[in-house]
Amino acid sequence: DALPIYPATTLMDLIREARAYEERTGETHTESVIATSMEEADIERLMNWPHTNLCTDGGLIASHPRGFGSYPRFLGRYVRERKIMDLPTAVHKSSGLAATHLGLRDRGVIRPGMKAVFVLFDPNRVLDHATPEAPQALSVGIEKVWVNGEIVFEDGGATGRRPGQIIRW
């Protein structure tokens, strides 16, 4: 008879393996879990809840597709293809509503004196291509990105400018 396998035990085993790998190779941040436990219908209902804002917890090390594809996936698959909400609502949930929920008073709306990230995208083309196997695959339909007035992405790539700042609250 096989012993039962508990999720917590499996997680601890994975963490131990990741730590051992890091010690052998010198690499860091090697452990990653991509959970796929939600049904699409539940995700769509949650996205449409009036209080849901769209954010991502992608980090500096792009080892998860959300770092390169969260918003293009939302805009392309859910807004354009599945039509779960209109584009202005989607943009508000990704900007103004998110800033309000996070208490970021100097962001989230277009107004003089506010800090801003502007994304020029084609709503008919925007779509993610990042996968767990290729987490840094660029999305399509993103033309330019400005951060605090400086272009940081154009012509299919980063410009090298880094005018953003860490937000601590």
Each language-model region and where it sits:
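Active-site microenvironment of metallo-dependent hydrolases
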Residues: A2-W169
